Every structure is written in structure tokens, then in C-alpha cells.
Design a protein with these regions (language model features):
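Long, low-complexity, intrinsically disordered segments
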Residues: 141-153
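Acyl-donor binding region in acyl/amide transferases
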Residues: 1-83
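Accessory, usually C-terminal, subdomains that scaffold auxiliary metal cofactors
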Residues: 57-139
Length: 153
């Protein structure tokens, strides 16, 4: 620990989107190494998102926390489906007990609804395929963003 308090290690408030109202947090997601690369993390995030909207119909945001190495690999956007990934801590990160970068991931309600509609359509169009194949198609289709802007029109 370098002597700074958690508040001193946090990034300035103005660096984050205006998140307010009912905010969902899906907690931690750990997929065993033997189960990775088959689409499970992609599917679980979307399932939690859809169930959260059903349970809490006024939920305006979903936020999470992701560590630097996963951000470097694009996991928050191309797997977890978060369009926003903002630096949260650059230094001592208490949950891991390490000096590292941690990021706040976020998606607002409109983005969640568009993502759910888009992903359901993709699953329906590829009903004969395995989830891992659908995820690869989704990543190609979305690039780095989880939502197709054209669906907003």
C-alpha cells in the first residue's frame, strides 16, 4: 500500500457517466478455466440482465467492476456486453489486495433493452448452432460495442 486512502486512489467523479436511480450489480462472475471459451460468460451476463429488468422494471443501469487484464483483452465489451468501461482505481485495489487498475463497467436501460432484442434475434437466427458459435458471430457483428445503433431507430 502506498499510503493513499481509497478516496485518494479513486478517479474523479466527472470521469464517470451520470449513473443514478435503481442500479443493478451482477456481483462477481467466475468461469472455471475448463468451461471458458464456450459462451457461458456471454450468456450468463445477458441472462442476469434480462432477469433483472423483469424483476426490477425500473432498473436504469447495470454496473460492474473489472480488473485491468480482462479490460486489455476486451472482455467487458465483447463478452460481458458493457458499452462503457471507465477507470475506477489506479493503484491499491482492496478486493484483490494488489496494486492494479480496476474499471467500472456500465450499461444503461436503453442499451440493455436493445442488446437483449439484438441478441435474442441473433440466437433465433442461429438456433441450430452451439452457444459458442453464436457468441463468435455476436462478437463479429458488434465489433467492440454490444448494441447495434441501427436498432435504436
Amino acid at each position: 500500500l502506498d499510503g493513499r486512502t481509497p478516496v485518494e486512489l479513486a478517479q474523479p467523479k466527472e470521469d464517470y457517466p451520470e449513473i443514478k436511480g435503481l442500479v443493478g450489480h451482477p456481483a462477481g462472475l467466475f468461469v472455471a478455466p475448463t468451461e471458458r471459451r464456450n459462451g457461458l460468460a456471454w450468456l450468463l451476463q445477458r441472462l442476469v440482465r434480462a432477469l433483472s429488468i423483469i424483476r426490477w422494471s425500473d432498473m436504469g443501469w447495470q454496473c460492474g467492476t473489472t480488473r485491468g487484464p480482462l479490460v486489455e483483452r476486451g472482455i467487458p465489451t465483447n463478452t460481458y456486453g458493457y458499452p462503457n468501461c471507465d477507470l475506477l482505481v489506479d493503484g491499491w485495489f482492496e478486493p484483490s489486495g494488489l496494486t492494479e487498475q480496476a474499471f467500472m463497467t456500465s450499461i444503461d436501460r436503453e442499451e440493455m433493452l436493445l442488446q437483449i432484442a439484438d441478441d435474442l434475434l441473433l440466437i433465433e437466427m442461429n438456433a441450430d448452432k452451439q452457444v459458442g458459435d453464436i457468441v463468435r458471430t455476436a462478437r463479429q457483428r458488434h465489433g467492440h460495442a454490444p448494441v447495434l445503433p441501427a436498432m435504436a431507430a
